[in-house]
């Protein structure tokens, strides 16, 4: 199913944090703790702004939303927060 990509991305990012390879996301998460966190938060802010700016064009909105979701998942993986915690929160809000 299409929604499985969220877990696949999360699992890949956790693996890249624990077993760094030569990739942008691995390097981002392997920086010194404070520097890595600051860079991830900066990227999240940038992507959130881009989603807002792209909201008048559906194609741009889809692209920028994917970026924001990716970096949100990256932040969760970096902080060691299980994806199921987010799913549980969404379920509790839906009920």
Swiss-Prot record:
Keyword Acetylation annotated: no
Amino-acid biosynthesis listed as a keyword: yes
Any one GO MF annotation of this record: ATP binding
Pathway terms, separated by semicolons: Amino-acid biosynthesis; L-histidine biosynthesis; L-histidine from 5-phospho-alpha-D-ribose 1-diphosphate: step 2/9
Family statement drawn from the similarity comment of this UniProt entry: Belongs to the PRA-PH family.
InterPro entries: HisE, PRib-ATP_PPHydrolase-like
EC number assigned by the record: 3.6.1.31
Stated name of the protein: Phosphoribosyl-ATP pyrophosphatase
BP GO terms, sorted: L-histidine biosynthetic process
Catalytic activity of the protein: 1-(5-phospho-beta-D-ribosyl)-ATP + H2O = 1-(5-phospho-beta-D-ribosyl)-5'-AMP + diphosphate + H(+)
Record localization: Cytoplasm
Record-linked Pfam families: PRA-PH (PF01503)
GO cellular component, one term: cytoplasm
PANTHER family: HISTIDINE BIOSYNTHESIS BIFUNCTIONAL PROTEIN, HISTIDINE BIOSYNTHESIS BIFUNCTIONAL PROTEIN HISIE
Organism per entry: Methanosphaera stadtmanae (strain ATCC 43021 / DSM 3091 / JCM 11832 / MCB-3)
Keyword terms: Amino-acid biosynthesis, ATP-binding, Cytoplasm, Histidine biosynthesis, Hydrolase, Nucleotide-binding
């Amino acid at each position: 199913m299409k929604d499985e990509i969220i877990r696949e991305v999360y699992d890949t990012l956790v693996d890249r944090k624990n077993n760094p390879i030569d990739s942008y996301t691995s390097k981002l998460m392997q920086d010194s703790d404070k520097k890595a966190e600051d860079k991830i938060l900066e990227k999240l802010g940038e992507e959130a702004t881009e989603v807002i700016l792209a909201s008048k064009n559906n194609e741009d909105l889809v692209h920028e939303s994917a970026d924001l979701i990716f970096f949100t998942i990256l932040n969760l993986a970096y902080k060691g927060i299980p994806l199921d915690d987010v799913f549980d929160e969404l379920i509790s809000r839906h009920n």
